[in-house]
């Protein structure tokens, strides 16, 4: 998407990679929600606030969510390549924490 100039789509996909990683972790605790806010709140309360994951991940989630909402819902929002690249980098960082967690818990 970056190569094709589809920066809004890149922001969307970066967010959803984070969101579904959160859902995977939450599922291990038997939790899911039909609302994004519920999924994120459960993760923050049960994993970030308890120190399982660093607080930095909450910031990554918030930035990704805000970017995705702008990209998806604001008619005149123009996403930049730089913004998309930064969001993809944050999503990769987030994924690395999730991967380590899953490996440490013998899921991967």
Predicted regions and their residues:
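Terminal alpha-helical segments
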Residues: 1-108
């Amino acid at each position: 998407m970056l190569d094709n100039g589809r920066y809004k789509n890149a922001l969307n996909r970066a967010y959803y990679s984070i969101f579904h990683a959160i859902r995977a972790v939450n599922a291990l605790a038997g939790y899911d929600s039909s609302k994004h806010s519920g999924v994120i709140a459960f993760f923050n309360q049960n994993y970030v606030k308890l120190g399982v994951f660093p607080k930095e991940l909450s910031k990554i989630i918030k930035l990704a969510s805000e970017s995705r909402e702008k990209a998806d819902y604001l008619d005149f929002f123009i996403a930049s390549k730089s913004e998309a690249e930064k969001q993809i980098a944050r999503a990769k960082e987030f994924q690395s924490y999730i991967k380590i967690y899953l490996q440490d818990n013998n899921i991967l």
